Swiss-Prot record:
Family matches, as Pfam families: M20_dimer, Peptidase_M20
CDD domains found in the cross-reference section: M20_DapE_proteobac
Name used for this protein in its record: Succinyl-diaminopimelate desuccinylase
Active site: D70, E135
GO molecular function term, any single one: zinc ion binding
Organism annotation: Vibrio campbellii (strain ATCC BAA-1116)
Catalytic activity, EC: 3.5.1.18
NCBIfam families, per database record: dapE_proteo, PRK13009.1
Function: Catalyzes the hydrolysis of N-succinyl-L,L-diaminopimelic acid (SDAP), forming succinate and LL-2,6-diaminopimelate (DAP), an intermediate involved in the bacterial biosynthesis of lysine and meso-diaminopimelic acid, an essential component of bacterial cell walls.
The keyword Amino-acid biosynthesis is assigned to this record: yes
Length: 378
């Protein structure tokens, strides 16, 4: 039996070992297909990362698909039922690294656009593709750099679907119409090292910090809103001491992260945490990593089109959620346009035996194509 166009393309992409930041030729495959549709292609290589921007049309609105060709490492091969880079169908599921996150989505995007343009060669507006090989890694030279390049020349995306695996039980049951912001602090509290038997000759930074850390951990940062839960403060890593039981440490290192709603900003978080540490008279260094601002698409033509497109395939409307981690949508949202995430079921992403239901790929392709029809068909 011959594979469908979307299944054949998904298999081709999965077979390429594109572990971050490698692309392994995935983008060349997509570019060849898009060139045949009349897209103008701009390859953007930054350091070790390969990206491309493709556009068909010059008029507004500019609708874009965004995604990534890179995947996380497969881990121990012996734990997989099949080779992670040899796509295999088992009981109606396509197995392979990237099947759900997110080479399946990429295949659906390309085939959906091929079908849409075949029926609508003179469509309204413009269609774009923003593809990177740096989403699973440090996200330094990927989507963010492409977005900066486009913004510098005044080329802003009006509407964007990011193909991240948003679904939970059934493809299309969840659309992410926003994401929380993320900020990480690396705090080093300074003390004076000494012998535990002579505490008066030392200054224990752990003891000095406990009240401040407790205050930060129990602070109510906000109450959230209709779209976001309250801001979360979590401590993932702490370290101090030499490993010896008789040495008071000279430094105490605490790493913390906040996932925050649109009720807060990076600036407010930095100010409040700095004020708390200063109030407790700590001697400290604090380095910040700004991972992304929160974004929200609560209304607009894109959201209406995506909800309708999912309903036409599933006969039920998707839930609109902002849960989960960050995605490249946070960078695209800087352009001021509407951004949503719609992709496969996420139950097996980053796991051994990652897989996606073959029928879900066909349904997702229909959802993407229907969205295009709602937005750009004349």
């Amino acid at each position: 039996m011959t594979d469908s166009p979307v299944l054949a393309l998904a298999k081709d992409l999965i077979s390429r070992q594109s572990v971050t930041p490698e692309d392994a030729g995935c983008q060349d495959v997509m570019i060849e297909r898009l060139k045949a549709l009349g897209f103008e292609i701009e390859v953007m290589v930054f350091e070790d990362t390969t990206n491309f921007w493709a556009r068909r049309g010059t008029e507004a609105p500019l609708f874009a698909f965004a995604g990534h060709t890179d995947v996380v490492p497969a881990g121990k091969l012996e734990q997989w039922d099949t080779h992670p880079f040899e796509p295999t169908i088992i009981d109606g599921y396509l197995h392979g690294r990237g099947a759900a996150d997110m080479k399946g989505s990429l295949a659906c995007m390309v085939v959906a656009v091929e079908r849409f343009i075949a029926e609508n060669p003179d469509h309204k507006g413009s269609i774009g593709f923003l593809i990177t090989s740096d989403e699973e890694g440090p996200f330094i030279n990927g989507t963010v750099r492409v977005v900066e390049t486009l913004m510098d020349r005044g080329e802003n995306i009006d509407m964007c679907i990011v193909g991240e695996p948003s679904s939970t039980e059934v493809v299309g049951d969840v659309v992410k119409n926003g994401r929380r912001g993320s900020i990480t602090g690396d705090l080093t509290v300074k003390g004076t090292q000494g012998h535990v038997a002579y505490p008066h000759l030392a200054n224990n930074p752990v003891h000095q910090s406990l009240m401040a850390i407790h205050e930060l951990a129990t602070t109510e940062w906000d109450q959230g809103n209709d779209y976001f839960p309250p801001t979360s403060f979590q401590i993932p890593n702490v370290s101090a001491g030499t490993g010896a039981s008789n040495v008071i440490p000279g430094e105490f290192n605490v790493q913390f992260n906040l996932r925050f709603s649109t009720e807060l900003s990076n600036e407010v978080i930095v100010q409040r945490i700095t004020e708390t540490l200063d109030k407790h008279e700590l001697d400290y260094d604090l380095k910040w990593t700004f991972n992304g601002d929160p974004f929200l698409t609560d209304t607009g033509a894109l959201l209406d089109a995506v909800v309708a497109a999912v309903d036409e395939v599933n006969s039920t409307k998707p839930a609109l959620l902002t849960t989960g981690g960050t995605s490249d949508g946070r960078f695209i949202a800087r352009m001021g346009g509407q951004v949503v995430e719609l992709g496969p079921v996420n139950a097996t992403i980053h796991k051994v035996n990652e897989c996606v239901k073959v029928d879900d790929l066909e349904k997702l392709t229909d959802m993407y194509e229907n969205t295009l029809k709602h937005l750009l068909a004349k």
